[in-house]
């Protein structure tokens, strides 16, 4: 089974990468952009989807500072 | 007293850590695949880029065989010092509270930093004779973060050991935190590098007091 894990900085934690990109966009003429956040995407094939959450908790994300979202492609 | 200095693929400061530890005692390297800590009295988790720092700094190293033994050693009260990448590894292993995030300036930054010693009576600062410490820092993932309840508990238990002096917090660490210990006081991590400040040749010997304090703690416990 194919799965994607989206990992992003928790709300309220300074995200300097997102801020830098947000500042760059108006300079290129893209107006009206807010709340830019940059995270990671992990794509993987798994036999047992129930393992994804413990994988995220233990390794793929750091739950102290990151939120994660599991997306399954059946 | 004998220090064990871990060596991971990608470590780069383990030789300086060995050299610094040998200024105050015996020391040997411990390879990441070894589970045997060879009877050492204290552990140093050194700086570098363990396992390439893939995914997050320190995230993969914490699952290495040697770290399983270090976690058991720490839980049994053994002294563990984590420097830079070693600090990141100890946070990932949950031996220390909080996490280290990319520097607010988004750059790898190398500079001499001035540190305030907040807690003087610890196993890692007891040999310090007062005043600021001048120690080099060099990292790109050094922004310390802990959530509000964790931070409050850390303050209550005297776990914030070192802070960047005013104007020195280049990485954006919360509350200028540069070094923290666990609640039991036997595990300590800091982003700056005391092992690079043990000889006048490199401009400062302020880092020696960290290693000397650990020796005092180990030998005091033996008496």
Where are these regions (language model features)?
Chain A
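Long, contiguous binding/interaction regions
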Residues: 2-41, 47, 53-74
């Amino acid at each position: 089974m194919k799965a994607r894990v989206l990992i992003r900085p928790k709300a309220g934690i300074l995200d300097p990468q997102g801020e830098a990109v947000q500042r760059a966009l108006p300079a290129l003429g893209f107006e009206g952009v807010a709340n830019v956040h940059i995270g990671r995407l992990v794509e993987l094939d798994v036999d047992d989807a129930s393992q994804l959450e413990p994988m995220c908790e233990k390794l793929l994300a750091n739950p102290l500072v990151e939120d994660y979202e599991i997306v399954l492609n059946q | 007293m004998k220090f064990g200095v871990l060596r991971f693929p990608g470590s780069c400061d383990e030789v300086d850590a060995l050299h610094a530890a040998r200024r105050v005692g015996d020391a040997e390297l411990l390879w990441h695949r070894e589970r045997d800590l060879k009877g050492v009295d204290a552990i140093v988790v050194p700086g570098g880029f363990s396992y390439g720092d893939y995914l997050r700094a320190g995230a993969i190293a914490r699952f290495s065989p040697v770290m399983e033994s270090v976690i058991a050693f720490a839980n049994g009260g053994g002294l563990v010092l984590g420097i830079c990448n070693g600090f990141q590894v100890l946070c990932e292993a949950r031996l220390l509270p909080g996490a280290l995030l990319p520097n607010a300036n988004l750059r790898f930054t190398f500079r001499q930093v001035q540190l305030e010693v907040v807690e003087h009576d610890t196993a890692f600062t007891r040999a310090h004779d007062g005043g600021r410490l001048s120690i080099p820092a060099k990292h790109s993932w050094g922004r310390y973060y802990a959530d509000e309840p964790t931070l409050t508990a850390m303050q209550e238990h005297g776990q914030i050991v070192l802070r960047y002096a005013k104007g020195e917090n280049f990485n954006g660490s919360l509350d200028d935190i540069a070094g923290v210990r666990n609640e039991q006081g036997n595990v300590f991590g800091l982003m700056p590098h005391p092992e690079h400040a043990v000889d006048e040749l490199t401009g400062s010997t302020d880092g020696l007091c960290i290693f000397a304090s650990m020796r005092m703690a180990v030998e005091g416990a033996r008496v």
